Structure formats: C-alpha cells, structure tokens
C-alpha cells in the first residue's frame, strides 16, 4: 500500500492547497509502481512550461531575434534546469516508486526529477488553469530569466564555431559507454577535433553528455590560447 501524498509539503511547493489530490497523486507516481503514472501529465506540463517561458521571453526581450529567444528557451526548459529546480524544491521526496526503481536510486535521478516537475505543472494547469501554472513557473524560473544577460550559446555550437574559425575539422562525438537502468541511464561521450584535442563527459542523456563534453573541450582549448 502506497504512503499517502504529503499534502502539506505539496502545498508548500505549489503555493496553494490542492483541491484535486487525484491529479497530483498521478503527477508524482513513477511508472515503476505498476499504476497509472505521470507520463501524460508530463507531456502536458512540458507544453505549458514552454508556452509560459516563450511568452515571458517575448515580453522581456523585445529586441531579441527568434534565434536568440530559442537559445534562451532551450536553456530554461532543458532537462538539467528542470531537474535543478525540482531538486531545490525537494520534489523527488514526494515521488512514489516501485521497489526496484527505489533501490536503483530513482529518487536521485535528474531525468525523473525533471519529468516530475513538468507533470506537476500539468496537474496545476488542469486544476487551476494557465494563470496558476504561470505564477508557479515564474516563481521558480523567474530569477533564471532575469539572470540571462545575453542569449547563451550552446556549447556544441560554440565549439563548432571555434573549430571553423581556426580552419580545423568539425567536432566529432562518440558514445564511450552507457550504464545504469533504463529509467536512470548514464552516458559517457567523447568529443574530439581531429588529433588536436579530446574530452569526455557524462550525462543523464546522450544530449546532456555531448553538451558537457563540448563545454569541457572548449574550456580546455580556450585555456590553451590564454
């Protein structure tokens, strides 16, 4: 029998007392339980998050191009950002897991944390509407938006530009290893620019590991030029 949802902790996170506990119970149930889980709410919450962030970027940065806004949105809505916010709120402590996922460390998975906060946004949207979802999103993401003084450049794009500007071959990425269970994988990716330099990094997804590897290699190359 599952433990009852901690409604007091949930209310502290979303900023209001939930009326429809069924929605929030679903938003915080992992598929490993064998019950209905958060995947559909995650799908919805991901779209709500994107809409609210895109609208806010459009309003706050009137001179920004479509490409600049896309770069900002990519960072703000990334799995890494969502996971960091979920962990700061201690949201994983409320997620229900099956025994195997729990013993595999599911509560410490960034992927699951990111999925859960999107599912929570989906539940909040269904229960209280777009304005409540917007209030929650801006309360948690607002400081990050304010902190974006310039549109961030994706490390892979920056590394590509570095190589092209110096007449080097474009970066090449390869999977070194993939470990961990399906719900909490760990990828190790290597990136190299010919025989000039190489770096490796890990991530909870192939994309995250590639990004981290590109950032590591770029930092190394730029450090050599100083």
UniProtKB/Swiss-Prot annotation:
EC number: 3.1.26.3
Superkingdom field: Bacteria
Keywords for this protein: Cytoplasm, Endonuclease, Hydrolase, Magnesium, Metal-binding, mRNA processing, Nuclease, RNA-binding, rRNA processing, rRNA-binding, tRNA processing
Recorded catalytic activity of this chain's protein: Endonucleolytic cleavage to 5'-phosphomonoester
CDD domains linked: DSRM_RNAse_III_family (cd10845), RIBOc (cd00593)
Localisation per UniProt entry: Cytoplasm
Necessary cofactors: Mg(2+)
Active site per UniProt: 46, 118
GO biological process, one term: rRNA processing
Domain RNase III, chain residue ranges per copy: 7-129
Binding-site list for Mg(2+): 42, 115, 118
NCBIfam families, sorted: RNaseIII
Record's subunit section: Homodimer.
Protein name in the entry: Ribonuclease 3
């Amino acid at each position: 029998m599952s433990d009852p949802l901690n409604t007091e902790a949930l209310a502290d996170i979303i900023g209001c007392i939930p009326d429809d506990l069924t929605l929030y119970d679903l938003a915080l149930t992992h598929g490993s339980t064998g019950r209905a889980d958060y995947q559909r709410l995650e799908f919805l919450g991901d779209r709500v998050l994107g809409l609210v962030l895109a609208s806010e970027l459009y309003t706050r940065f009137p001179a920004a191009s479509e490409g600049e806004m896309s770069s900002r949105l990519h960072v703000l809505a990334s799995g890494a950002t969502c996971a960091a916010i979920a962990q700061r709120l201690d949201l994983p402590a409320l997620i229900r897991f099956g025994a195997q996922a729990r013993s595999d460390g599911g509560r410490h998975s960034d992927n699951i944390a990111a999925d859960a906060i999107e599912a929570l946004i989906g539940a909040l949207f269904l229960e209280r509407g777009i304005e409540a979802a917007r209030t929650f999103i801006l309360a948690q993401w607002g400081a990050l938006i304010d902190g974006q003084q310039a549109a961030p450049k994706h490390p892979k794009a920056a590394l590509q530009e570095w190589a092209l500007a110096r007449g080097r071959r474009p970066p090449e990425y390869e999977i070194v290893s993939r470990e961990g269970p399906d719900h909490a994988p760990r990828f190790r990716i290597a990136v190299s620019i010919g025989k000039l330099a190489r770096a490796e990094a890990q991530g909870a997804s192939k994309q995250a590991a590639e990004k981290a590897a590109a950032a590591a290699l770029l930092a190394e190359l730029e450090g050599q030029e100083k």
